[in-house]
């Protein structure tokens, strides 16, 4: 049985990825942090479709919780697909950004991804596929999310470095940089802000997690 591990796999883009991989025949091990209801809904939907899925509460900034995740039987049986999707975005004005918020964002978005990788890297199959969810903001910055942009930029360089190392071994590493996607991150947008985002998109619509 092929196994996919998706961090932050219980909602938004992560939820859509979990359901798509399940439809492709993978059993799904997804993580969430604190809010279990969305993750449980994704798991129920996957199970109703005839595939197997489990949700695990895991704070990716906590090395102990990440180490515990790595002891899950499905991890021990080898991971075919690893999706590093978790993240946080606090929408803080760059002038108000302080070290506390910067560290919290970097700890979650970048260091959390590294912790997961470090804990499960020896449990990946020889032909494993690793997908890192970055962001277009990682290349262009943001007046209300410089910490988020910096964390995604760090993810991009790290993912490219992994790809250079692991490619010759048969493992593929890719980073995806979504633009505007209709998830919790955009929930606080005003109508005017949403309209301005749409104008930036050639299709003239906000993306969906299923895209």
Regions picked out by a protein language model, each given a short descriptive name:
Residues 93-94, 98-103, 186, 197:
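Substrate-binding pocket helix/loop in short-chain dehydrogenase/reductase
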Residues 117, 151:
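Active-site helix of classical SDR
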Residues 122-123, 164-168:
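Alpha-helical segment proximal to the catalytic Tyr-Lys
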Residues 95, 140-146, 168, 204:
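Active-site loop immediately N-terminal to the catalytic Tyr-X3-Lys motif
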Residues 26-41:
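Conserved glycine-rich Rossmann-like NAD(P)H-binding loop of the short-chain dehydrogenase/reductase
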Residues 10-11:
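Conserved glycine-rich cofactor-binding loop
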Residues 135:
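Residue(s) in the substrate-gating loop at a strand-loop-helix junction
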